[in-house]
Amino acid sequence: EVPSRGLGDVYKRQLITPSGKKYDTLKEEDIVFVSNDGNHDTNLKPSSEWRFHKDIYLKKPDAKAIVHAHSPHATAVSAHGKDIPAFHYMIALAGGDSIKCAKYATFGTQELSDNIIDALEDRKACLMSNHGQVAFGENLESAFELAEELENICHQYINTIKLGDPKILSSSEMDVILEKVKNYKKG
């Protein structure tokens, strides 16, 4: 239906924040319209991470908005390059029984994008080794809420492991929780 309205293939281009600009100074006109090959129509350069945004949109039909952040706790946990196990049931909000950590690759590369796509299998959020986090949702608000929740989970995980090895919820318990969170915040 979208192409018939003359809008073309919406997954061939995206709106993304510019590279190197402080978020608290962004204006509407600073947002960069970028095509899937990285071409853009302004003097501002798109974020170097446009590639993995594009690939998430292409591979995850339910991704309508993406939040990528170098939030302090997620970045700290990501520096260990390990998945976060089900130490808390809220892990399920990301869509699985753990928070996956994408393997490290240099920022802005196809390799990083591929690693993120692998880590997002059956999930809506992941850590990016030695980098930060990425989360997506059906709109910007839900993507941002999930990114905030992932940051909270990482903070809790840091505090938990200070006390030793946490008790990990079983796969069967996480299956029950995953079923329950399908309708979380849906009224």
Predicted regions located by residue number:
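Single conserved hydrophobic/aromatic residue that forms the stacking wall/gate
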Residues: E1-Y11
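Divalent metal-coordination and catalytic microenvironments
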Residues: R5, I56, H70, I116, ...
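An anion-binding catalytic pocket shared by soluble metabolic enzymes
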Residues: D9-V67, A74, D83
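Short acidic/glycine-rich loop or secondary-structure boundary segments that cap or lie
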Residues: D24-T25, A74-S78, Q110-E111, F136-G137
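A structural-propensity feature for long, helix-poor, extended segments
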Residues: G95-S129
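A conserved C-terminal secondary-structure "cap"
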Residues: N115, D122-G187
